[in-house]
Amino acid sequence: MKPSIVAKLEALHERHEEVQALLGDAGTIADQERFRALSREYAQLSDVSRCFTDWQQVQDDIETAQMMLDDPEMREMAQDELREAKEKGEQLEQQLQVLLLPKDPDDERNAFLEVRAGTGGDEAALFAGDLFRMYSRYAEARRWRVEIMSASEGEHGGYKEIIAKISGDGVYGRLKFESGGHRVQRVPATESQGRIHTSACTVAVMPELPEAELPDINPADLRIDTFRSSGAGGQHVNTTDSAIRITHLPTGIVVECQDERSQHKNKAKALSVLGARIHAAETAKRQQAEASTRRNLLGSGDRSDRNRTYNFPQGRVTDHRINLTLYRLDEAMEGKLDMLIEPIVQEHQADQLAALSEQE
C-alpha cells in the first residue's frame, strides 16, 4: 500500500480514538447537538479504523513469518503463515480502498421516493402500488419510517403517482440507484386470453436537504393553486381547499400535496419536495456533464433509464445496468432488495476505483 494512503489511514485512526475520548467527556454529553455530530463521525470512522488495525496486525504477522523462514525447522509452517497473511492483507487493502472512496454527502440523508405509473394504464398504476409496497417493506425491515406526502390513486387500485418521505440512517445512499424506469411483464387479472402485458413505472429518489441547502426559489417563479383534497370520504372528508399544487414556472416542475388537513402544512411539504426535485435536476445535469465519458449507474428518474424488468410468469427480475438476473421475484416484491441493491453498489464502487486509478 502507498505510504501516502497509510499516512491518511493513520490520521483517520487517530481521529477515531480522539472522537471516542470526546464522546466520554461530560461536556460533550451535556451538549446534545455536538454529541450527535460526534456520534455520527465515530460511526463513519469505525469501519476504517477497525479494518486498518487488522491490516497493521497482518503486516506484523508477515514480518514475523519472514523472520521464521531462516529457521529450517520452522520454514514450512512459516511459508504457510506467510501465504495466508499475504492473502488476508490483499483482501484488507481492497476493503480499505473502498472505505476511502469519496463519500456522497447526501448518502446519509432521508429521501423522497416518487413512484409514477407510466405506459400501461390501469396495469401500470397497479404495478406502481406493488413497487411502493416493495419499498415500504424494505424500509420496514431496515427500521426506516415511511410518511406519505402525496398520493393520486389509480381508478382500479394502485397509484397514478405516490410521493413518500423515508427517514432513517443512510436512506438515500441505499435507495439512490432505484431512480429510473421499472418495467413489469405479467398477465393482468382482466386478461381472459392469458396474454402477457408490458407496463412501466418510473421511480425517482431524491435526498431531503436541510433548509440551509435548499436551492433559492424566487416566489415570483411559483404558481400556487389550492383545491379540495380527494381520497377516502367518511367522517374526515375534507371540506376545505387545503390541498396544494405548486408549479415552478422556469422548470415546469409540479408538486401536489394533499395529505395534511392544514393548507399551511401541505404547502411546507410541497415546497420541501419541490426544492429536492430542483436540486436533483441540477445534480443530474452536472453528473451528466461529468460522466459523459463514463457510464453512470445513477438513474435520473427518467423513463428512458431502463433499470429493471420484473417478469412474473418466469418469476424473474433483471437489472439491465449490470446484466444481473435472479429468479427470486417473489422475495424481491416482499422487500428483500439487498440482493439487487448490493451488486449495483459494488459495481458503482468498482467504477469509482477505476476512475481514481485513472487520475493517478
UniProtKB/Swiss-Prot annotation:
It comes from Citrobacter koseri (strain ATCC BAA-895 / CDC 4225-83 / SGSC4696). Methylated by PrmC. Methylation increases the termination efficiency of RF1. It is found in: Cytoplasm. The modification N5-methylglutamine is found at residue 235. Its main location: cytoplasm. Keywords: Cytoplasm, Methylation, Protein biosynthesis. This is Peptide chain release factor 1. SUPFAM superfamilies: Release factor (SSF75620). InterPro entries: PCRF, Pep_chain_release_fac_I, Pep_chain_release_fac_I_sf, Prokaryotic/Mito_RF, RF-1. Belongs to the prokaryotic/mitochondrial release factor family. Transmembrane segments: none annotated. Gene3D superfamilies: 3.30.160.20, 3.30.70.1660, 6.10.140.1950. GO terms for molecular function: translation release factor activity, codon specific. Signal peptide: none annotated. It holds the Pfam family RF-1. The gene is prfA. GO terms for cellular component: cytoplasm. Residues 284-313 are annotated as: Disordered. It comes from the Bacteria. Peptide chain release factor 1 directs the termination of translation in response to the peptide chain termination codons UAG and UAA.
